[in-house]
Structure formats: structure tokens, C-alpha cells
Amino acid sequence: MGGNSVLEIVAYGAWNGGTVVDNSIYEKKGLSFKGGVPVNNKTIEERMGVRTRKVAGTDERIGVTALQDLLVNPDIDPSRIKLVVGATNVGDDKYDPGPLIRFPYEFLREHCPNAHVMDLYAGCPGFNVAVELCFMLSLSGFLNTGDITVIVGAENIHRAQSFQPDNTANIIFGDDAMATALKTGVSHSPGGQYFNDQTKNFNTTKDPVTAMAEAIYALNGSKKFDGLIVDNQLGNLIYRVPATAARVQHALVKLMYPDEAENGLFNRFRESLGFYDQNIRAFAFDIMTLDPKPKKVEALAKAYVQSGKYNNIISVFLAPDASGTISLHRGTDFTFKRPPTGIIDTLTSTHGCYADYIQALPMGDDVFGDMDGKGVFLYATRGAKSHLNELLSPNSITMDQIDLLIEHQANFAMIPLTLEQVLELPKDEIKPAVADLVANKLVTNVHERGNCSVVCMQRLPYDLKRGALQKDRLQGFKINANLDQLKKANLILNDSVGAGMTRSSFLQKL
């Protein structure tokens, strides 16, 4: 590890199995995209960039396999593992009440029985959000020098039957699982003053989202907040996709800004995006602790405050019966000191006004995923500029200084359009610059593995390091054209977007 780093990614483990499934299986189903466009190999690649994806066996717990592979690494001492996070959404079984991390953790329990263990629900950016959580815990002194965090990402979309059989969303997803070890370096003793003097209990028989928003508003009024963390023990997919915290965030925003809610501002995409970027600027995600107690989520919120990056955090413990406890956490005089190496900065932003863009819905006696493809595409491409500027500018970094961009592989068509929004160049220079960046600074695998949801951020650097990526062309762009140089990258930007809607990013300096 670098001598002055606070947190570094030190090892990966992977599930490398599965059956390769090409587009012919969907072509044979006789499906159509919106507008009556027939589903075939050509239209799938043109719209999504996907040629093949991996499908796991029906009897595999692929997250366990990834963790086992990680622990083969002789540099990982399981007794030093202090935090285990399951960054996932659906996992192996959409009916599983969670926490989904309990299956991998059983493989670890004897080595680290006192570890903090939890799921984290934040859509596809879940890994990045988990990295930020670990960064906060390291900055605040919750994690100490030499402590190891393990983040397990596992999405078995096909086994879980996440979408209805005739939903074209099935086409884009692939199964995957990775386990990542992060080590805390320099330990910090936080200065400043921490306050947690406002709490409120709630109990409801109505919609828990409304109940939580009203209880928070009664406690905090219209005061701004930097983040909302919910320990969500409801144990139902419809309350974790999107994260319940994202829906609570927006319900609270409507109480804070009743005039804007009344005039329908939040139903107009461009206006609501600008309003959130200017007035809200807060993250929202769920956890589900293995041994649930209100004090656990409160300890995490405290760490965010003590990191110096955030001043006002709301924590909620939501019990299985929809009762719970809300706490306000605030701090003064804590200072965020950017480390020179390792993870140097992070940022997560949630726009809960778009929570319906990706959601799990009850359908008859079952539950299935539902996506507003146009809305997701708009948010992914139009929401990046403000978010990335907020991360890069305080670090005096510009996009052209990034050596390696690890971008979520939701849909290849999103990536060039996102970069067109982000790059600050004259109009006639944008497209050539984007093509150069895609070819020489970006790693791509969506054409071979599909959208692997939360696992993308772990899979891409792992496959780069082991030489599993190949030069190719996709939708008219050269891809993976500079792999040898990217293996030597010094400044790395990880960026992901997904349900919530949430965007989460972090910077690494090696």
C-alpha cells in the first residue's frame, strides 16, 4: 500500500463460470422493441451493444464462488476482515428476504465472527457506493490500519427471473459475481464536534415511505441534508429496487418544496434534474444489516459526518413491521483531507424524483422488474456533467487528465453520448475526442458479458489486469485499443449509474 493512502483496492476474486448465450435465443422468441422493431442480432447490437452474455447455472451461488476465489489470495488474512458488504440488488433469488450477503458470509464467519455484515442496495452503482462507505469508515477511524473490507457483488438475473419473459430488458443483462478486498491504510482520529441529539420513533400501518418522510420532516423541517441511509429490514424486493431511501428522499423533497411539487416541476425531466442538482445534492441508499440494531446504521451515519466530507446525515432504522427510529447526525469543524494515493475522493448523488425509472413491481402473484428505458437513458447521459464536475473540480482534475475510465456497462450507446455531455470542447471537436477516449482510455465488455449490474465496476479492472479484454469495434467505435497502456494507469475514474436514480463515482491514484 502507498504510505499515505487511507484506502486501497488490494485484491479481486471472481466467478468465471456460466454458459455463453448469444442473441439468437432472443431472436427466436419473436420479440419486438418499442416501435415494432424486430429483435434480432443486428438490432440488439445496434441498440444495446450486446452480442453475448453469461448465464449462471440454476444451482450456483455465484457470490460464494467469487468470495472463495478471493480468499485463495495469500495476501488476504480473513481474520483482518472487519466489514463485509453485499452490494447487490436481486441476487440469486428475488423472493429472498435478505440480507443476501449471509450466504457468502457463512464461508467467512469462523475467521471473522465479529465483522460488520450488511447488504447495500443502491442499484447498479452499489459497488461504488460501498467503496464510498468504506472510505468514510476509514477516514473517520471506524476502520483502522490494516483492516480489510470485502465487497461481494453478485447478480444472478436469469436464475432470479427478474423480468417477465417477454420483457426486452432480459436481453441486456448478464449474470456475474465478483469479490473485492479493500485495505484501510493511514488511520485518522477525527477532530471536530459530532451531534446526534435529535431522534424520533415512528410506527405506521400506511405506506412506510410516506411515514418516514413525514417523520423526518417533523424532525428536520426544510433544512438541507447531505445524505440518507436506511437500514431497511422489510425484506421485500419492491422495497429495495429502487432503494427505499431514494423514494423517501423524494417524498421529503416534496414536503420541503411544496410549491414546486404543486406546479408539477418534478414531472418535467430537465427542470427536475436542474432543481435537484442546485438545491438537493444528496445521496440516498439502503443497507440491511445481518444483526439488525438501530445503533448500527447510526454508527455509519456518524462516520460520514466525522469524515469531514458531509455535515448533515439522516439515518433510519426500518424494522420488519414498518416501525422504526430516525436520527439526525451533524458535525462542525471536521475536515476532509484528500489522501495523495489510493482512493482519493468519492461522490454519490441521488435524484429520487426518478425512482420509478427502474423499479420492482408486484404483478399478479409475482414481482418483476420494470424499466423506463427512455428515462434511464436520459438520466444516464444528461446527469453526468454536473455530478462529475462536482467530483473532479475540487481535486483540480479534468477529464483529459484521467488515464483510465471505468464506466458502467448499462448500454454501450449511453457511453459516447454521456461523454459528449461531459467533455468541455468546441462542438466540432467533441465527436473525435469522444471516439479517442472510448478507444484509448475506456475499458469495454458489455458486448461480451452484457450489463452485469452492480458487478460491472469490479469485473472491468479485473478483466483488464488478467488480459481477458480484446480489441474490437462496437457501434462504429474502436474499443479496448490501448489495453497495455491502461494496465499502467495512474489516475482512474470509476463511474456508475442506476436505480434510484443514483450516480456514484470515485477516484483512484495509484
What spans do the regions from the language model cover?
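Condensing-enzyme catalytic core mediating Claisen C-C bond formation in acyl metabolism
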Residues: 1-57, 165-206, 210, 222, ...
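Structural signature of outer-membrane beta-barrel domains
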Residues: 14-16, 157-158, 235, 412
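Short, flexible, mixed-charge acidic loops at enzyme active sites
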Residues: 26, 97-105, 358-361, 419-422
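Claisen-condensing/thiolase-fold acyl-transfer catalytic domains that form or cleave C-C bonds
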Residues: 60, 64-67, 90-100, 111-112, ...
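Membrane helical hairpin/interfacial module
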Residues: 78-91
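Amphipathic alpha-helical segments in well-structured domains
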Residues: 100-104, 174, 178, 245
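Flexible, glycine-rich active-site loops centered on histidine and acidic residues
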Residues: 139-177, 299-316
